[in-house]
Curated annotation (Swiss-Prot):
Predominant subcellular localization, coarse grouping: cytoplasm
Gene: ackA
Cofactor: Mg(2+); Mn(2+)
Assigned GO CC terms: cytosol
UniProt family annotation: Belongs to the acetokinase family.
Protein name stated in the entry: Acetate kinase
């Protein structure tokens, strides 16, 4: 039986990230990004093999961009595409695993939009456009929140009036589930352990960041909550703050809820602390030049990350290893070293040479001999979405 091809789509409000995944090959035959959709500057960029190219598509919407992409995908797939996997940010409590998309699923995703107003409507745009263009192909939704539906109630409930949960779904959902699941499976494979008999602390660190406690292949706790704002310090997101900050700023500065929400999501985190940048690479460079804001931002980021990992350990029966993934987790030896140094009670120690070597896609163990396992594992959410899609086609 010839190997199968899955197109993976991740739609934002004005962008489409795409990858063609072949089940038999680790490299993507085709991948790219359509961005600034709906504007005169809309552009489609792609890589195929070692070649890169782009095409201006002025005023194109999601459907027009996908239509431009269609012949490219068919050509790269050798004329045979077997299905389309869609990343959907929020599945609420309705979806605990990947699901074939039909009218009922579309309406359920629409119903969860109030829980992810910036993401789910955009995800739906991509789904509806793709289903129009590829009506005969199976479409599968893979939810960021689904992996965390195994959280026990004591981990997902807030200490709020019960009616808010029962009537309005106010609870902790968690995100980055596809990434945490993928790297925990890879970690078990690398360590020679069974997924169903292993326990991991996972740190997905990028512009959005979260930690996760994974036991026997299930998420038992995670740092993000009702929204992706809860938890760690991130690129522009504050992470955890005093819940009374809203009323304090409204009372003392006269700020509206919208202004406070924008500040916490778009002006805080590494950017707010450093007053310089949300990019860890820039901050590390500026720290070397003596920039105090950059140094502080990195210190706060690593300390808060270590605190979160320590908190996640409450859900583990034993620790088989700590996993670093995501753009920062995969590429910042400094962040990994500083975080490990804060976790002295875990007896974590890193091998400096191994830590320095694991960047730009290099995976591997970075712990010093005789100390608990620490792994750097590049995430591959596109491949995981493709695998979930293929599983529903079998």
């Amino acid at each position: 039986m010839p190997s199968r091809n899955i197109l993976v789509i991740n739609c934002g409000s004005s962008s489409i990230k795409f990858a063609l995944v072949n089940e038999a090959h680790s490299l993507f035959p085709l991948h790219g990004l359509a961005e600034r959709l709906g504007s005169r500057d809309a552009v489609l960029r792609w890589k195929r093999g070692g070649d890169s190219d782009s095409l201006m598509i002025p005023n194109a919407d999601h459907r027009a961009a996908l239509a431009q992409l269609l012949p490219m995908v068919q050509n790269a797939a050798g004329g045979k595409l077997h299905g389309i996997g869609h990343r959907v940010v929020h599945g609420g409590e309705l979806f605990t695993h990947a699901t074939r998309i039909d009218d009922r699923v579309v309406e359920a995703i629409r119903a969860t939009a109030p829980l992810a107003p910036l993401h789910n409507p955009a995800n739906l745009q991509g789904i509806e456009a793709a289903m129009t263009l590829f009506p005969k192909l199976p479409h599968v939704a893979v939810f960021d929140t689904a992996f965390h539906q195994s959280l026990p109630e004591h981990a997902y409930r807030y200490a709020l009036p019960e009616a808010l949960y029962r009537e309005h779904g106010v609870r902790r959902y968690g995100f980055h589930g596809t990434s945490h699941r993928y790297v925990s499976h890879r970690a078990a494979e690398m360590a020679g352990l069974a997924v169903g008999d292993s326990s991991w602390l996972s740190a997905h660190l990028g512009n959005g960041s979260s930690t996760c406690a994974i036991v026997n292949g299930q998420s038992l706790d995670t740092s993000m909550g009702l929204t992706p704002l809860e938890g760690l310090v991130m690129g522009t997101r504050s992470g955890d703050v005093d819940p009374n900050l809203h009323s304090h700023l409204a009372r003392t500065l006269g700020w509206s809820l919208e202004r406070i929400d924008s500040m916490l999501n778009n002006e805080s985190g590494l950017l707010g602390l450093s007053d310089l940048s949300n990019d860890m690479r820039t901050l590390e460079q500026e720290r070397e030049q003596g920039h105090p804001g950059a140094a502080l931002a990195i210190e706060v980021f690593c300390y808060r990350l270590a605190k979160s990992l320590a908190a996640m350990s409450c859900a583990l029966p034993q620790l088989d290893g700590v996993i670093f993934t995501g753009g920062i987790g995969e590429n910042s030896p400094l962040v990994r070293a500083k975080t490990a140094a804060h976790l002295r009670l875990f007896d974590l120690r890193l091998d400096q040479e191994a830590n320095a070597r694991c960047v730009r896609g290099v995976a591997g163990p970075i712990q010093a001999a005789g100390h608990p396992r620490v792994l750097v594992i590049p995430t591959n959410e596109e491949r995981q979405i493709a695998l979930d899609t293929l599983a529903l086609l079998d």
